Structures are given as C-alpha cells and as structure tokens.
Amino acid sequence: TIIHLSCLVFIMGATSIPYWPNKRPFYEQPLYLFQIISPSAIKKYGIINYWIYQYVSLQPVSENSKQYIHKFMKQYYKRKKSLSNNHHNKNLILILVESLQSWAINLKIEGQEVTPYMNEIIKDSTTLYFPKIVPQVKDGRSSDAQLIINTGLLPLMTGAASSLCATNTFPSLPSALKEKGYTSISFICDNRTFWNQGHTTIAYGFNHLYDQMQKEKERKEADETLFQNALPLLKKENSPFYAQLVTLSSHEPYNTPIIVDSPLMRKKFINNEARNYLIAIQYVDRCVKHFIERLKKEGLYENSIIIITGDHEQMTFNNYEGRVQQTVEDCFVPFIIINSPLKSKNTNCYFSQVDIYTSLLDLMGCDSYFWKGLGESVFNNDVSNYATFRANVAVKGEETPDSIRNYKNECWRVSDILLRMNYFKEPH
C-alpha cells in the first residue's frame, strides 16, 4: 500500500508540473492553461492531469478570505463615486484586436507607415488615444482580455477564468447597458468552444454570440471576413447596441508573412518575426479602415462610438529593437476612442487594462450601475498615473502615494477571491 501510494504521489507530482502557479518572471508569457471546456480537456490531457489542474487552480476560499472580501467590498461601495452625467443612446462598437500593441502605431520603417489609417484617425479632434495601457492578462490570454474589459475584474492568479468560472454570475458592461435598453452582441472568428466563449459570452450578459465568422477562410483572411460578415448583422440590429468584434489575423506565430507583397517585405529588420508581426498589423489596419468606411456608407458611423484596443502583448518592442531585457513599457496596448462625446486631459498617463471597463461605463453614461469595476476612468479629473502589469509589477508617474500603490496591487488578490467564491451570485 505504501509503495502504491508513493507511486501515485510521484505520478501526480510529475504530471502536475505544468499546472503549478506561474512563478516565471513577469516578462515571460504566462502558461496557456486549458483553453477548452472540461470534457475536451479531460479527453486531451487525461483525467488525472485535469483533476490536478482543477485542484491547484480552485482551492476553496477560506473563511478569512471571505471576511477580507466582505470588508473590502463594504469599503469599495463607500469609496466608488457615481460616474459623469453623460447621457446618450449611441451604439458602442468595440474592436478587440489580436496582439495589437501601441509601439506599432505611428511607426515608420524607412518612411513606410505600418498603420496609416490608425495614424490618421488618432489625429482627429473627436478621437481620444491612450497609448500607455498596461495589459493585465494572465493564463487566459485573449479570454482574460474579454473578462477584464467586460467585467472590470482582473484574471485569476492561476488558471483561465473562462474555463474555471464560466458558470459564475458577473457584473458586466452588457448588463449595465441593458439597463439603458441596449442589446449586446459578440462576433468571434473561432469556434465558440475555444476559450469556452460560448459559456462566458452568456455569463457576461451578451444577448447573442456569432462564432466562426472567418467561415472557411485561412487565418490571414479572417479579419476581412469577420468585418464583412458582421456588417449586415449590425445593419439589422436595432439601435442602441453594443457590438464586440474580436479579430484573429494578427495572432502568433509570425513565422511567415500573411501578405507577401507588403512594402514592409523590402525593408530591413533585426528579425523576420518582428517584420511578419508588423505586416499582420498593417493588414489589420487596412481591414479596420474598410470596416469603418462601410459603417459610414451604411449610416452607422455617426451614431456610434468606436473603440479599438489590443487584447495583450505578444511581439514586444524590445524584440523589434533586438533587446533581450523587457520592460513594462515594451508591452503597452492602445485604447482608441472614435467619436468620443467626452474629453480627457489624461491621454499621456499610465492606465491599466482594467481601467477600460470603468472608462466605458463613463463613456456610455452608465452612472447608476452598481459595479464600477476595480479600475479608474480615463475621464477622471485626477488619475493615479499608476498601472500594474502583473501583481507587484507596475509603471508609475513621478509621484504615487503608497495608498494607491497598495490598493492597485491589492486588487489582484481581491479579484482572484471574488472569482473563486462567485461573489456576485448573491446580492450584497
């Protein structure tokens, strides 16, 4: 019996190595943990591996943690103020671009612009551009970005919330907009089982999910097909609506260029992967241009606020420059607001990805919604100018009080517990 038990412990230890909490440096990519639903994970990885993963990732929330959360949330509701009095019924169209990073915008390679269209629109007086958004995704990668932007929560410290918390009750942007009469729809290129989006889309309060929007096209043509197929569906949708479009074409790997006749093919680069990444971003820029031009032609543009943002870092700026050492600044993603009804004096400040949710509530006039998120609005008069990349890794302005730094870092633990205990299932 002792021998059998010892063997079992050894096997469990050996097979569980990929599932231990991520201890790697912040500049390395998090582990990709189970981006599929439970039955598929069991079939692919085996019941023992999946059980270990569940066990490690979803330890029961202790009574001390529950008391800590109740105390935190009590103070949270006292501290969070109503948002600006900004009332309108404009549509919200959010384009979540795969791996789009700020350093690629306004970049010229030997005189050749990488993103000529985005370069043009960020100069418009009705457009706001925040280039210093710190991505906060962890093991869930793209699915974590949807969680952060749509719920104002941070990811699990270990594991993908899309797999482990898909049956949770979430406060969300779609739910806030529903109170104002909005319908929320999401368009994705992948199958709905990928990152468990079929379940999380419902959990986040969306009314409809349109998946496999790339149809039978290859990845390099996915975004063009996504926008083409989404447009007639948007035309049929009654206003006001919130539409989330999740792109795919700029996904890794960057082994080969998706456009072989791109002008960037004739330019000099330190490495080919950086070149191929920028070629993919150049293609996305063109697709976004055509989509927005069609919105104008179909009469949807003027009555819509359009958001362009990246889901996470991938080809970071240091790789483009040939530097080994990576900083948080190398990982910034953009936050672009087209047709913004609000102004902001904070466009050059540091913000966290979780701040996008709070800012969108502000932008859409959801001032009465109970959950303002764990972030701060880019439209606030005073902002912290402090953003966390991973827990305890941050960028900051000249002066950051300890109270702000402590609160921002505390939010990682808070969100992890909120998710694991399904806090919002019961009214508080």
Residue map of PLM features:
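N-terminal secretory/membrane-targeting segments
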Residues: 1-90, 107-115, 119-123, 127-129, ...
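Solvent-exposed soluble domains appended to multi-pass membrane proteins
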Residues: 71-428
